[in-house]
UniProtKB/Swiss-Prot annotation:
This is Protein TRI1. GO terms for cellular component: cytoplasm; nucleolus; nucleus; RNA polymerase I upstream activating factor complex. GO terms for biological process: nucleolar large rRNA transcription by RNA polymerase I; transcription initiation at RNA polymerase I promoter. Residues 91-110 have a biased composition (Basic residues). It comes from Saccharomyces cerevisiae (strain ATCC 204508 / S288c). Transmembrane segments: none annotated. The gene is TRI1. Present with 2360 molecules/cell in log phase SD medium. It comes from the Eukaryota. The keyword Acyltransferase does not apply.
Length: 226
């Protein structure tokens, strides 16, 4: 296992930017083979287990996608170097130093306080079954996923023969059915998470519709009498 641990930073990086509904151990493994120019067929089982383990950890701790210790790896150093090269042209323009400084200050100030529209902060409304399961009417989406994963691990609901499969208990069944895969969880959750702004907008549209119908009905009455 120690030999494949060197792939952890890259596995985390791939998982953190991938759509959880579409990603799979096979795709991540193929990406590793291309990036490292190696054949991992002989270690397929170990690599798959590592990918599943990292996926679970990332879903449970969505705000800590890559461990700090792993940032010293070659791949992460390369990413940071490329990022610095992209930023270099902005720093080299000394004529606009004042504007650049004011922009950077504004960016820094903006980054210091959490954005209320950020996916990690913005709360969504939960469906009735999900409210009953988690005990809250609204939560940030990332917190919902984290709490579900904590419940899965605490109750040991992963299939021991296939860790990708979650065997739902009575509390989870109303939301996810009898079983699901760890990669389909996010897709299934979309049916139980609602944007408050969209609900308010929908309610306002519904209120306006009857008024329009009444107006049209009243306008048609004179024609009938004539």
């Amino acid at each position: 296992m120690a030999d494949i641990n060197k792939y952890i930073p890259m596995v985390d990086a791939i998982l953190s930017v991938s759509n959880p509904d579409e990603i799979s151990p096979k795709r991540v493994r193929k990406a590793l083979q291309i990036l490292y120019s190696v054949n991992l067929d002989s270690q397929r089982k170990l690599i798959n287990e590592l990918i599943l383990e990292r996926f679970g950890d990332i879903q449970e701790n969505p705000r800590v996608l890559i461990p700090k210790n792993d940032l010293i790896s070659r791949d992460q150093e390369l990413s940071l170097r490329l990022q610095k090269e992209e930023e270099r042209p902005l720093r080299s323009t000394r004529k606009r130093k004042g504007k650049s400084e004011s922009k950077s200050k504004r960016k820094k100030k903006k980054n210091d306080s959490p954005d209320s529209n950020s996916i990690s902060v913005r709360k969504v409304l939960l469906s009735a079954p999900l409210q009953k399961f988690l005990g809250s009417e609204e939560l940030p989406r990332t917190q919902v996923v984290k709490m579900i994963w904590q419940y899965i691990k605490e109750h040991d609901l992963q299939n021991p023969k296939d860790r990708r499969e979650i065997l739902c208990d009575e509390k989870m069944e109303p939301i996810f059915g009898k079983k699901m895969t760890m990669f389909s969880m996010n897709k299934l959750l979309t049916k139980h998470l609602f944007n408050p702004d969209e609900i308010v907008k929908h309610e306002e549209e519904q209120k306006q519709t009857p008024e329009k119908e009444i107006k049209l009905e009243n306008e048609s009455l004179p024609n009938l009498s004539g």
